[in-house]
């Protein structure tokens, strides 16, 4: 991650790698090996690149990020499909409150979260029932206590534009716990 900073706008260039850490040889109850797209891992090394931009304004901040994952061939001659994720967020930061010498700072957040997923490819054949675009509207709350931040949000699907026959996404609960070091 490379970060450019000034008082008005913060920009970060993101780069990373998704490592093949998940199992690729799981079997069903009858002993048959699961298809590659049903395995916990893909068995591929996938580079990720992206960009994040943030701009504070008074008690608010406006944030955007996007990243692209280039999927490589993994187990069972399968390519899980490239993906592109993108997020837009607005945060309203309330004034902090002191509680027993600890600074509590609540924030309200509203986000648009999107992901596009390419079709899975098995032995050079595309699976028409994989991939597509999904966009969520996600209102949420962040509670910061000194260097610890807890995030909670609900994602309501705005767009379920999947390829082929796939179940639609429902409401998602997102949580995170962050410690600033």
How should each PLM-predicted stretch be described?
Residues 77-181:
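Outer membrane beta-barrel transmembrane domains
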